[in-house]
């Protein structure tokens, strides 16, 4: 039985980790921390966990946490993870970090978009934890940088096209809509019910969203050349989910059926990627609460563009579910263990 700690359990990714790990047959959650709510029962913070987690939330004391766990999930804000991850690694623990602190290959890029990096020497040692791209590297990793939610949806949507060199690498566009939980659990005026309900808006327009360089780094590695992407995120009036609509110009003519077949073959062995039949497009409703990424691909013959639509649950495949998927791979467990749940319908 794996002993697991969840560090920073007061947010949505933290509670989602607890929800998923409760159903994992090879895991015992032995430590749960929250600086804001230390001393309170977990169920006080999240009544949905009542009767399933009897623990009291603890202060974050890295040595004490490490004594209790084999695997540590850090669900902390950016920068906060950097303050504790080195200690966990020195103590021989394996870490899956859900912040952006270790997603970049170089400190300069991180610092351009976030802030000064406290331990840049760890960046080359971290594995970007998108299993469908880096499964072999994740298997032997000590530190996994769990991908962002938007990048997960976009990278999975584009991977077959880039690997097969089917589209121009210039001019790729993604319009992506996320549920409000993607903004976190903290109180913000923009996320109040009356501000979000019955509305749909773009934000981070003009290439300023922090997930942009993360996408570009990974897409460039897939294409083996420098890629820039026009990425515009949107806030949708729903709790959870991401729908990315991605546009690329085909280098050679192809039909919808041909590309749907290519995608189906490319992802045929993947447990959590479902390719829709030719002409089908996914919905966030069909992945809600699950670890699936649903993908549809359509060719616009008039313009010579291919349109890829991908749907994920931002809190599951876009965060905590993917983190558990990475844990399974790191520990030599069946990849889908604890993640077999289907979408919540309706």
Swiss-Prot record:
Functional summary from the UniProt entry: Catalyzes the NADPH-dependent reduction of N-acetyl-5-glutamyl phosphate to yield N-acetyl-L-glutamate 5-semialdehyde.
As one GO molecular function, the record gives:
NAD binding
- Protein name listed in UniProt: N-acetyl-gamma-glutamyl-phosphate reductase
Q: Which organism is it from?
A: Geobacter sulfurreducens (strain ATCC 51573 / DSM 12127 / PCA)
The source's superkingdom equals Bacteria
SMART domains in the record: Semialdhyde_dh
What protein family is recorded? Belongs to the NAGSA dehydrogenase family. Type 1 subfamily.
The reaction(s) annotated as catalysed by this protein in its Swiss-Prot or TrEMBL entry are: N-acetyl-L-glutamate 5-semialdehyde + phosphate + NADP(+) = N-acetyl-L-glutamyl 5-phosphate + NADPH + H(+)
State the InterPro entries in the record. AGPR_AS, AGPR_type-1, NAD(P)-bd_dom_sf, NAGSA_dehydrogenase, Semialdehyde_DH_NAD-bd
Its GO biological process annotations read:
L-arginine biosynthetic process
Q: Which NCBIfam families match?
A: argC
Question: Mind telling me which GO cellular component terms the entry cites?
Answer: cytoplasm
Q: In which pathway does it act?
A: Amino-acid biosynthesis; L-arginine biosynthesis; N(2)-acetyl-L-ornithine from L-glutamate: step 3/4
Q: What is its EC number?
A: 1.2.1.38
Location within or outside the cell:
Cytoplasm
Q: What UniProt keywords apply to this chain's record, in alphabetical order?
A: Amino-acid biosynthesis, Arginine biosynthesis, Cytoplasm, NADP, Oxidoreductase
Q: Which CDD domains match?
A: AGPR_1_C (cd23934), AGPR_1_N (cd17895)
Active site annotated at which positions?
149
């Amino acid at each position: 039985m794996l002993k697991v700690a969840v560090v920073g359990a007061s947010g949505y990714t933290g509670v989602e980790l607890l929800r998923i790990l409760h159903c994992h047959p090879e895991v015992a959650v032995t430590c749960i921390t929250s600086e804001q709510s230390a001393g309170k029962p977990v169920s006080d913070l999240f009544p949905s966990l009542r009767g399933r987690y009897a623990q009291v939330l603890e202060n974050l004391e890295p040595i004490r946490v490490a004594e209790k766990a084999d695997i540590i999930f850090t669900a902390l804000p950016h920068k906060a993870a950097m303050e504790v991850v080195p200690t966990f690694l020195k103590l021989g623990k394996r870490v899956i970090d859900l912040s952006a602190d270790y997603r970049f290959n170089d400190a300069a890029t991180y610092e351009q978009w976030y802030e000064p990096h406290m331990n840049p020497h760890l960046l080359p040692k971290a594995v970007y934890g998108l299993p469908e791209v880096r499964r072999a590297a994740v298997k032997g990793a000590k530190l996994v940088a769990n991908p962002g939610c938007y990048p997960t949806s976009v990278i999975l949507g584009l991977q077959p096209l880039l690997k097969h060199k089917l589209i121009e690498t210039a001019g790729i566009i993604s319009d992506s809509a996320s549920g409000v939980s993607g903004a976190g659990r903290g109180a913000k005026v923009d996320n109040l019910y009356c501000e979000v309900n019955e509305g749909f808006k773009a934000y981070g327009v003009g290439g300023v969203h922090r997930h942009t360089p993360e996408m570009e780094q990974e897409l460039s590695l897939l294409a083996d050349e420098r890629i820039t992407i026009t990425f515009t995120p949107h806030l949708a009036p729903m709790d959870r989910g991401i729908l990315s609509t991605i546009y690329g110009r085909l280098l050679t003519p192809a039909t919808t059926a041909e590309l749907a077949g290519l995608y189906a073959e490319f992802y045929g062995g993947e447990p959590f990627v479902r390719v829709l039949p030719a002409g089908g497009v996914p919905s966030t409703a069909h992945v809600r609460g699950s670890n699936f990424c649903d993908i549809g691909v359509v060719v616009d013959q008039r313009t010579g563009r291919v349109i890829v639509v991908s749907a994920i649950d931002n809190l599951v495949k876009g965060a905590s579910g993917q983190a558990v998927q990475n844990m399974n791979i790191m520990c030599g467990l069946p990849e889908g263990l604890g993640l077999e749940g289907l979408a919540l319908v309706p």
